[in-house]
């Protein structure tokens, strides 16, 4: 009887036994630039503090500025400490304000608790350029340690394509691409005339021509990836059907560096994203370039959008004026959207 009671007690009280908090120490070895504006540590409640790697990202085409980004995975409440390493703290804003994050300040540090995964901007003294982007991801449910049949694996470290002139990596049908924590891919991931492709993980696509390009394809799933400072789109879709995006983050600071742009596509499902772009964060078009026809059945929810330049959401603007039957954009739904900036 005592044994049964002990097991029941573990089941009731042992939620923290399997609690997980991952801070990606592999990020220290990628060679990507570090930003020392802030020191960020996280811990489970009452646990030991864990260091994060403060990546340097660039924002705002009008005045390109070095901002900071940290990432970690969590599946239970965590405590966060942010130390400002230059200057005094006079004002603190944690956005989106809809998250209602309360903080405590101790000298040049602030402390706050996150009860669930979410994507935030932490801003000191009204500075929205040299700010901290804090990405608390859900814990990964699927990971890989090496490449195998049907799996393209990118481990910690920097990866460049073999065909450097093209600066792209082509993904065939029926492939899972896994970017491990600490993986940095300096190339566009191209899904062209393919189907049943998944691009997942916690790695980074860094300064590619485009982040992920999906053309004339179907059933493409993207989850957890971060795209940092591409020349052009973070995700581009053309003439494709069934594109799903989850837990996606992106930064850009150049002209025409939109976030997620799709044209002549159907069945687009986007959830839990953070986009800070120097062009439209989300754009939905009809005909453009090599793709014709309408765009329909688009569902966007739980999105944080920050347009340093242009629009958080842009619908229309391109089409086929010579079409005899016309093209339509229809069945678009947007829910739970936070707009942090729009600046034309």
Language model: regions and residue ranges:
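Glycine-rich beta-solenoid repeat tracts in large extracellular/virion proteins
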Residues: 166-171, 184-193, 207-216, 233-239, ...
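Extracellular "leader-to-stem" segments immediately downstream of a signal peptide or signal-anchor
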Residues: 14, 18-173, 184-187, 193-198, ...
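Well-ordered, non-transmembrane segments within structured domains
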Residues: 150-175, 181-183, 188, 228-255
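Sterically constrained small-residue positions within well-ordered secondary structures
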Residues: 10, 71-73, 113, 145, ...
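Right-handed parallel beta-helix
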Residues: 174-176, 181, 195-205, 218-229, ...
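Sec-dependent N-terminal signal peptides
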Residues: 4-13, 174
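Generic structural hydrophobic/aromatic packing signal, biased to beta-strands
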Residues: 80-82, 112, 122, 134, ...
